[in-house]
């Protein structure tokens, strides 16, 4: 089901405006049955089902202004703006022990991770804090993470949605200009995005060592 409402305007034979609002409800999306009892023997081979539901909505706006100074010289200015949101409505999820592990009702593109509470300042603080078994030996200067479920250890159960934004930007925009004189044309265009979260993890200054920033 999709609703699309659009408006096109032209003013003074120079300014054109196009605006659109869309609202799409997608259903019958093919996915694995996650809420499937292991007792049925399908733990490693979960059946497929058309139970997925996703909502998408947003707006699109474009503006163009053209000014003719002479029959040989004219200028164009243009801009565009797009804002979109979405969320999972149904994923056939199992009943998780912690409500923050569910994806239903949350954006498709979001960022999950551990909640940082500063840095460890001493070995004594490490010894008196929840155990962090995240692949390396914890030392003073390492990041201290929150024990969200209070079980005395930091593991995957403590990962939560730390940002409603993911790698897909919710906002995209652009600005451009063209100047035309006879057979010559000059143009510039700028574009950008916003409401996006990326994890900067491709470059690690400490390699695979066990050291941290306070030891370099």
Predicted regions and their residues:
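Short, glycine/acidic-rich beta->alpha junctions
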Residues: 1, 55, 165-176
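Extracellular/periplasmic, surface-exposed regions of secreted and cell-surface proteins
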Residues: 1-111, 179
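Short, surface-exposed charged micro-motifs
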Residues: 6, 135, 176
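Aromatic side chains
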Residues: 21-22, 114, 120, 145, ...
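C-terminal beta-signal and adjacent terminal beta-strands/loops
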Residues: 26, 85, 178-216
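Conserved active-site-proximal loop/helix segments of enzymes involved in bacterial cell-wall
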Residues: 30-35, 156, 204-206
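Glycine- and acidic
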Residues: 43-47, 159, 170
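Conserved small-residue
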Residues: 52, 66-167, 207-216
């Amino acid at each position: 089901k999709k609703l699309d409402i659009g408006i096109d305007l032209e003013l003074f034979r120079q300014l054109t405006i196009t605006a659109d609002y869309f609202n799409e409800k997608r259903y019958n999306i093919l996915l694995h049955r996650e809420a499937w009892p292991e007792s049925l023997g399908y733990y490693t081979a979960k059946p497929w089902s058309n139970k997925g539901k996703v909502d998408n909505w947003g707006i699109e706006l474009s503006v163009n202004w053209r000014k003719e100074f002479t029959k040989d010289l004219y200028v164009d200015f243009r801009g565009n703006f797009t804002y979109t949101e979405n969320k999972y409505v149904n994923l056939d999820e199992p009943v998780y022990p912690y409500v923050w592990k569910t994806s239903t009702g949350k954006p498709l593109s979001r960022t999950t991770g551990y909640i940082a509470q500063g840095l460890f300042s001493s070995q004594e603080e490490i010894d008196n804090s929840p155990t962090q078994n995240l692949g390396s030996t914890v030392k003073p200067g390492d990041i201290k993470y929150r024990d969200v479920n209070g079980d005395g250890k930091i593991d995957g159960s403590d990962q939560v949605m730390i940002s409603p934004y993911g790698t897909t930007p919710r906002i995209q925009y652009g600005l451009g200009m063209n100047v035309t004189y006879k057979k010559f044309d000059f143009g510039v265009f700028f574009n950008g995005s916003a409401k996006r979260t990326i994890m900067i993890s491709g470059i690690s200054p400490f390699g695979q060592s066990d050291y941290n920033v306070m030891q370099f």
